[in-house]
């Protein structure tokens, strides 16, 4: 079983959020986008696998032009672990950040982000005409302006243009 943890896998570092991910350790693989809560540039993603052989079965190729670069022994040929043959050292940036910031501090920052979404929800509910579409969870709260005097169709017509220009606040 694969878990798409692109956004949510970072909750494993959070004291409060990790309870939402009970059972994730049973998965065969997890994808995780470190650029989504870990102060990384876009494109810093990780795939964690229980069995390396699954990556090898998925991506291994043996073109003639790579035969002279083949490794012997227990070291993997990294081109057999993913689709890119040449890749930037994205993992080094993540590793360095983890060494400097630490997993405990990242957990605190994620917990803080989740608390801020809950606080935003409380503030939004204080104003008439605003409704919560999806309650605060994992650092996100979805809301819209929906005055009672307008129908759902009118509220949608009012909010659609806003969603094109203001995706996040």
What is the role of each PLM region?
Residues 47-76:
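Conserved core segment of the aminotransferase class I/II
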Residues 37, 43-50, 73-132, 137-141:
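Structural motif of enzymes handling amino- and sulfur-group chemistry
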Residues 1-56:
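Conserved PLP-enzyme active-site core in the AAT-like
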Residues 3-7, 125, 130-131, 152:
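Non-catalytic, mobile gating and regulatory segments of ester bond hydrolases
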Residues 6-10, 62-65, 134-142:
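A glycine-rich phosphate-binding loop feature that marks nucleotide/adenosyl-phosphate handling sites
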Residues 165-169:
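Conserved small/polar residues in nucleotide/adenosyl-binding loops
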Residues 131-162:
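Conserved PLP-binding catalytic core of the aspartate aminotransferase-like
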């Amino acid at each position: 079983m694969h878990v798409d943890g692109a956004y949510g896998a970072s909750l494993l570092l959070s004291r409060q959020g990790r309870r939402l991910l009970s059972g994730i350790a049973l998965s065969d693989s997890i994808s995780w986008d470190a650029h989504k809560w870990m102060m990384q540039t876009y494109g810093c993603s990780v795939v964690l696998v229980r069995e390396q052989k699954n990556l090898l079965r998925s991506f291994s190729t043996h073109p003639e032009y790579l035969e002279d670069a083949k490794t012997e022994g227990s070291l993997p040929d990294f081109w057999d672990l993913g689709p890119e043959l040449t890749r930037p050292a994205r993992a080094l940036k993540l590793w360095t950040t983890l060494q400097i910031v630490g997993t405990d501090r990242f957990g605190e920052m994620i917990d803080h982000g989740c608390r801020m979404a809950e606080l935003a929800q409380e503030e939004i509910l204080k104003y008439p005409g605003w409704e919560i579409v999806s309650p605060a969870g994992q650092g996100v709260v979805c809301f819209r302006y929906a005055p009672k005097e307008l129908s759902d169709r009118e509220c949608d017509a009012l909010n659609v243009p806003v969603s094109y220009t203001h995706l996040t606040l």
